[in-house]
From Swiss-Prot:
The active site is at K246, D378. It catalyses: ochratoxin A + H2O = ochratoxin alpha + L-phenylalanine. The Zn(2+)-specific chelator 1,10-phenanthroline inhibits the enzyme activity. Detoxification of contaminated food is a challenging health issue and ochratoxinase is a promising enzyme that hydrolyzes ochrtoxin A, a mycotoxin demonstrated to have nephrotoxic, immunotoxic, genotoxic, neurotoxic, and teratogenic properties; and that occurs in a wide range of agricultural products. Changing Y206 to S/G: Affect substrate binding and carboxypeptidase activity. Zn(2+) 1 binds at H111, H113, K246. Belongs to the metallo-dependent hydrolases superfamily. Ochratoxinase amidase 2 family. Optimum pH is 6. The gene is Am2. This is Ochratoxinase. Homooctamer. Its cofactor is Zn(2+).
Length: 480
């Protein structure tokens, strides 16, 4: 087995730390060389069979199982069922066994922003003032925290997720699976515009027709006007590695001067965005608040709607008829209400207060109507993402089992055909699995305590558990 070797020294831990044990990671001098390697490359002759025994197994979709077992063979779930029914061939070839109180699929957050700047919500201006290297460092830390907290997948809907995903996938950093839109597409004077800056400054940095020599077109926002510009904008995001396309189809809260009730982009522009994405086997996710934008996004063929603050029965029936996913993002609203708008410009704070009640009624209405829902927070990697499960239950009206389904089994729908088989504990699915020390069906807030997440497997590899170091290495024998 080839490994990048690091020594991990526990540091002083604050009782209030959201991270659990904090480590100082430094390279081992014996392992230093000039060739960058993946963190872990397993040899082909390893057995790679893991058996996990669980007092309670929550499959993601379906009823929980008592006294269950799950077998991971390589990266795939090979068996799920009663521990008495484990095929003997796995018992003979077991590499490792674990016994845990609760086992379930890894969590998803389906509405992240990989901005990595220190003041994202202040009218987006800090995004242009923050060096991408600083953004990358913050995002690396946040992605590590996310995995430790039980989040094995993120959908990024405006940010550097495409670039961070490459670093995670090649083993440079540790984090969840990341499915990114790249930049969110906005019209001029739309939700992705930066009204506090001169138009030339914004268009020079984020305008789709203005990529400079050596410029990757890799920012969190992309301004495009007219059918040819939006077509190019979609193609640029796919070139960058986008797995889903994000469009601002109405005004928003954080954009200082637009109106959340007004639709953005013309029907022709939206149609081209959806068609161009579909040509590359991608779905389109639409930011929408007001009904005009909601209906335009539905008509254009968007398959995932975010926020949907001013919806009614007509909207819910259309979403069910067309198989459209709803991601409510209640957390960001609750967080700002609780802080009295701390960090927001006054215009954004006024808009958030104006739509908060309507958004909650819409969320509750969607749940009662049976709309398919996935959970997302509209926050940054490593943030308080587990709050969304609590709000789904306590504010939205879901049962804990329904909230878990929305955070696991439903979540891959948010990236359409680009999603692998994951989000459920089923045979043939990727082994993105977490273990808990307490039952979330009895207390949904258990996800907010990182220590309650005792084990995390991503793609069959154990990244958190007894004897596992901060980089997913075997801390008991790091030289293997």
């Amino acid at each position: 087995m080839v490994r990048r070797i690091a020594s991990a020294t526990p540091m002083v831990q604050s009782p209030m730390s959201p991270l659990g044990t904090t480590y100082c990671v430094r390279p081992n001098p014996v392992s230093l060389n000039l060739q960058r390697r993946p963190l872990v490359i397993a040899s082909t002759d390893e057995a790679k069979v893991t058996i996990i025994y669980a007092g309670l197994l929550i499959p993601g979709d379906g009823e929980p199982l008592r006294n269950a077992a799950l077998v991971i063979s390589d990266k795939i779930i090979a068996f799920v069922g009663s521990e008495a029914d484990i095929p003997k061939k796995y018992l003979r070839s077991t590499q490792s066994t674990h016994r845990v109180p609760v086992l379930m699929p890894g969590l998803w957050d389906c509405h992240m922003h990989f901005g990595g700047d220190d003041d994202y919500y202040n009218d987006y201006t800090s995004g242009l003032a923050t060096h991408p290297a600083s953004s990358g460092a913050r995002l690396a830390r946040g992605c590590w925290e996310a995995l430790q907290n039980g989040y094995t997948s993120y959908r990024d809907l405006a940010g550097y997720g495409c670039e961070v995903a490459k670093a995670i996938n090649d083993g440079t950093i540790v984090g969840p699976n990341v499915y990114s839109s790249g930049a969110a597409l906005s019209q001029t004077a739309g939700h992705g515009d930066i009204f506090a800056l001169p138009a030339g400054e914004v268009l020079g940095s984020y305008g789709v027709m203005n990529p400079r020599p050596g410029y990757w077109g890799a920012g969190p926002l992309c301004i495009a006007d007219g059918v040819e510009e939006v077509r190019r904008a979609v193609r640029l995001q796919i070139r960058r590695g986008a797995k889903v396309i994000k469009v601002m189809a109405s005004g928003g809260v954080m954009s200082r001067d637009d109106n959340p009730n007004f639709a953005q982009f013309s029907p022709e522009e939206l149609k081209v965005i959806v068609e161009e994405a579909a040509r590359q086997n991608r779905i389109v996710s639409a930011h929408v608040h007001g009904k005009a934008g909601i209906m335009a996004a539905i008509k254009a063929g968007c398959k995932s709607l975010e926020h949907v603050s001013y919806a009614d029965e007509e909207v819910w029936e259309l979403m069910k008829e067309k198989g459209i996913l709803y991601v409510a993002t209640r957390s960001v609203i609750e967080i700002f209400l609780a802080s009295n708008g701390e960090g927001l410009v006054k215009e954004s704070w006024a808009k958030l207060q104006a739509l908060a009640d309507s958004h909650l009624k819409a969320y509750q209405g969607a749940i009662k109507a049976g709309v398919t829902i996935a959970l997302g927070t509209d926050t940054a990697p490593g943030g308080p993402t587990a709050l969304e499960l609590q709000f789904a239950v306590e504010r939205g009206g879901m049962t804990p089992l329904e909230a878990i389904k929305a955070a696991t089994a439903n979540a891959p729908l948010s990236v359409g055909p680009q999603a692998p088989l994951t989000g459920q504990l089923r045979e043939g699915y990727e082994a993105d699995v977490i273990a808990l020390e307490e039952n979330p069906l009895e207390d949904i807030k258990v996800f907010q305590e990182p220590k309650a997440v005792t084990h995390v497997w991503k793609g069959g590899k154990l990244f958190k558990g007894p004897g596992i170091g901060p980089w997913g290495e075997d801390a008991r024998n790091p030289f293997l």
